[in-house]
Amino acid sequence: MSNETNCTLDFEQSVELFKEYNLFITAFLLFLTIILQYGYATRIRFIYILKMIVLWCFWPLNIAVGVISCIYPPNTGGLVAAIILTVFACLSFVGYWIQSCRLFKRCRSWWSFNPESNAVGSILLTNGQQCNFAIESVPMVLAPIIKNGVLYCEGQWLAKCEPDHLPKDIFVCTADRRNIYRMVQKYTGDQSGNKKRFATFVYAKQSVDTGELESVATGGSSLYT
């Protein structure tokens, strides 16, 4: 008699297993649906943070499952596939951390570790406050607005400020570049009391260099002139 135990589930056992855990599966799928549908920085920030945590957990989970697949492969072909996928997951995870650390070194913002974006926008207000926001790519134009005393850019709430707090230049940093945007147009309302309620600013991409935001912040008052 063979001492090996067959651990394969048949159809009836699979159905029973699903019936036993269907409530957990339903709740888990609903959680993922809410996270993916509403997890945007421009919508509900709390759900967006949960989404980032889920994405951060996926890479270590993939690596762990890949290692288990390498230890217990179904056959030789499965072992080769498991090794390839695990190595790819490890390289991708390491590459993410390298790029994120390079971006953090350039802009000093925790948005650098956002797994959904490759760039971080920075607005250094004239009152000394620094506003950072995640941005998916480097645009040609940025248009921050002030509405009811609150600064928004790319649809994201940044800070409370006044129209005269906006600087001459703002920045979008990537892992290897600093993109400089120069203010080319602004509208700060009329004389009927709207000046402090709404303002629009247009910044066009002017130049690209390899500097860091820290060098700009400590470079004197020329930034705000």
UniProtKB/Swiss-Prot annotation:
Parts of the chain that traverse the membrane: 21-41, 52-72, 78-98
One Pfam short name: CoV_M
Top-level taxon in the UniProt lineage: Viruses
Intravirion side stretches: 42-51, 99-225
Virion surface compartment spans: 1-20, 73-77
Record's keyword terms, sorted: Glycoprotein, Host Golgi apparatus, Host membrane, Membrane, Transmembrane, Transmembrane helix, Viral envelope protein, Viral matrix protein, Virion
Keyword ATP-binding in annotation: no
CDD domains: gammaCoV_M
PROSITE patterns: COV_M
Recorded GO MF terms: structural constituent of virion
InterPro entries, per database record: GAMMA_CORONA_M (IPR042550), M_CoV (IPR002574)
Predominant location category: virion
GO cellular component, one term: virion membrane
Entry membrane topology: Multi-pass membrane protein
Subunit composition and interactions: Homomultimer. Interacts with envelope E protein in the budding compartment of the host cell, which is located between endoplasmic reticulum and the Golgi complex. Forms a complex with HE and S proteins. Interacts with nucleocapsid N protein. This interaction probably participates in RNA packaging into the virus.
Functional summary from the UniProt entry: Component of the viral envelope that plays a central role in virus morphogenesis and assembly via its interactions with other viral proteins.
Family per record: Belongs to the gammacoronaviruses M protein family.
Name used for this protein in its record: Membrane protein
Organism placement in taxonomy: Viruses, Riboviria, Orthornavirae, Pisuviricota, Pisoniviricetes
